[in-house]
């Protein structure tokens, strides 16, 4: 009885991974198609599943110092659907922090955050003191961060502060569910 349960569990786990791989390929293909329709050439890209499902994916690609963030819904029995998202400028130390000493506490913190964010660091003009991990957000089309570091370029000897921005409000949950179900979003 235990062996049968273990075999069934192993089969289901393998099936889930295979379905996940197929869905990832579909989402990546849609990302490439979307960039092509925009006349963009992808420099780097990443496609990640959203919370606890294999249907709704967050697509991010880079071109000319900007990240383009979109949601891609790849239903099991439907055509893929794209929800166009936001764009955010990539943080480039030589451009956004040219006077920051290379051998400073803050420069080390920025380098560490960049490493652990796989280089997907964004900066918003209205909040230039925040470095955002673009890979994660409450909504798959948004550049509003789940977390970021707060930097003060006038104090390079001070550590950056880690800040969370989680939002589980009813409005966010409803919008996420609408994306997941493939509904029209205003």
Regions found by a protein language model. Name each.
Residues 10-14, 38, 95:
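Generic signal for short, ordered secondary-structure residues
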